[in-house]
A protein has these predicted regions:
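Basic nucleic-acid-binding interfaces
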Residues: 2-22, 26-72
Length: 72
């Protein structure tokens, strides 16, 4: 599972994210995507919306069972 918490998401990026994620609250997106899709999506966002603030919580195969990344 992946959770994205974003600030001021541009409409084009928000629409793209809704392909794979549901948005229970504005700018909070939750979905189950594989590692490759998640990394490609984050790369696309960083390239096309470099000023977007984003917190990413994702399940991982580590001792905690999840990872936390922050951008912007």
């Amino acid at each position: 599972m992946t959770v994205l918490v974003c600030n001021d998401t541009p409409p084009a990026i928000r629409g793209m994210l809704k392909r794979w994620f549901v948005e229970p609250k504005p700018n909070v997106l939750v979905g189950t995507v594989n590692h490759r899709t998640r990394e490609k999506t984050l790369e696309y966002i960083r390239r096309n919306a470099p000023n977007l603030g984003m917190l990413v919580l994702a399940t991982e195969k580590n001792s905690q069972g999840f990872s936390v990344q922050q951008f912007g």
